[in-house]
Curated annotation (Swiss-Prot):
Keywords: ATP-binding, Ligase, Magnesium, Manganese, Metal-binding, Nucleotide-binding, Purine biosynthesis. Catalyzes the ATP- and formate-dependent formylation of 5-aminoimidazole-4-carboxamide-1-beta-d-ribofuranosyl 5'-monophosphate (AICAR) to 5-formaminoimidazole-4-carboxamide-1-beta-d-ribofuranosyl 5'-monophosphate (FAICAR) in the absence of folates. Binds 1 Mg(2+) or Mn(2+) ion per subunit. The gene is purP. Pfam families: DUF1246, DUF1297. Its cofactor is Mg(2+); Mn(2+). Signal peptide: none annotated. The keyword Transcription regulation does not apply. This is 5-formaminoimidazole-4-carboxamide-1-(beta)-D-ribofuranosyl 5'-monophosphate synthetase. Its EC number is 6.3.4.23.
Amino acid sequence: MISKEEILSIYEGYNKEEITIVTVGSHTSLHILKGAKLEGFSTAVITTKDRATPYKRFGVADKYIYVDNFSDISNEEIQKQLIEMNAIIIPHGSFIAYCGLDNLENNFKVPMFGNRQILRWEAERDLEGKLLKESGLRIPKKLNSPDEINCPVMVKFPGARGGRGYFPCSTTEEFWKKVEIFKERGILTDEDVGNAHIEEYVVGTNYCIHYFYSPLKNQVELMGIDSRYESNIDGIVRVPAKDQMELDINPSYVISGNFPVVIRESLLPQVFDMGDKLVAKAEEMVAPGMIGPFCLQSLCNDSLELVVFEMSARIDGGTNSFMNGSAYSCLYSGEPLSMGQRIAKEIKLALELDMMDKILY
């Protein structure tokens, strides 16, 4: 693991007057880059030429770093170019997937906003479950083997895959039947199946809660809440029940979009309590803990209990649903505030206070 001291020593060689905010052109890069520009930073996007159009049309990037493949982002030549432009990387789900956790931990030496150590804790289900459970959050019951399935469960797989390959089932036989279907489609591999995470199926409404923890202010902020459009399950529910049976469609849960939601105000104390507990425990277990944006993906059951089924330890894709601010983020200052701009504000404040060591790794 690259040490924080090594990253900070690289940052010390930067021209602090010419910091460039950089991310990979995907996931949440539009409002990351736009937010940085609104706070006066220079911006750059790492992209392939065939995917540069949105960033040019929206005008969010000052510079373009072209790669043949996104996996090239950890190449020494690209890293050297980033360091020369005084880059601070904002990691998101696609960046982590393309770079790879091992590379990120051991080879990628460009200063990043947040805590790179905690990214493995969101990717590996056992570590994620341990952190959520020890934080005192309600999580779905985990089954250790397909042989234990005797009730409705949800089957998930490691990494940031946007729900691809997830499926529900109720018996061991149904588990293996669906596994074979997804393997035939090229969606799952034997390695995926060996790492399957099987958990209790919680019936409830979906709330993906987006927080920001400021180590400079020692404050957990609620930035917004979204829910997801998932294919093909959201299409299936529009088909009459009798036709669903005849069509015999296997549901999938691939996230194809997000929409903003608000939660009952009486549930907000529970929402803040969950964020506070996770931040406190993360600092204890994976120092320096949650830095900046994170997300708790939850289901609210009919007892109005929020059950957390997943976490993101970095900016989550659902923040795209409030690029011009959310019903919650605007309450802090009365101005529209995206998660991307909130990140940029934290970096700007850290520069002013000479406290970049609190937010970089």
